[in-house]
Amino acid sequence: MTEPAIQIEGLRFAWNGAKPVLDVPAFTLARGERLFLRGPSGSGKSTLLGVIAGVLVADAGRVSVLGQELGGLSSAARDRMRADHLGVIFQMFNLVPYLSVVGNVTLPLKFSDRRRRIVGGDADAEARRLLGRLGLTDEALLARRVSDLSVGQQQRVAAARALIGGPEIVIADEPTSALDSD
């Protein structure tokens, strides 16, 4: 049997010791499977994604991502796992304001040999290809700092950054919230 992409058992998480916002008895997501989380604001969706991404640490339970039990990893090891295996689109895009559009998209490759090898020799060309698939093709725009872009354009840059290097799991927290319907 193939190891699941994500496996959760007895997960509990609370902010600063308050009432738990997450209480997940059991959950498994198979490799290749897609999942859409739906719920009202404040229901814990972003918190759950943060725990799965290893940005937040569960108070109790077991969270495994691609066979790695996150609770047993140091902060640096969780960062390495995330850099090598996860593409993440955060609600607050976390783009580096002084980098160009292409520089922001290729940034994950500076932290992951694995993703850099997958992209191969021309990271800028791969960034442009991904940006083009997301509707950003103007070369002058791609050379600009991301802080000069519209919020919708910034969200497209964040999506391309999450996808570069073919991560095994993409975690997207409201990835289309700033995009127009086209």
Region spans (language model):
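Helix-to-loop junction immediately C-terminal to a conserved catalytic motif
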Residues: 53
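Conserved ABC transporter NBD signature motif
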Residues: 61-69
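ABC ATPase NBD coupling module
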Residues: 70-87
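Short coil-to-helix segment of the ABC ATPase nucleotide-binding domain corresponding to the Q-loop/switch region
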Residues: 99-108
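Conserved ABC ATPase signature
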Residues: 145-149, 153
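Conserved catalytic motifs of ABC-family nucleotide-binding domains
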Residues: 166
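Catalytic Walker B motif of ABC-type/P-loop ATPase nucleotide-binding domains
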Residues: 170-173
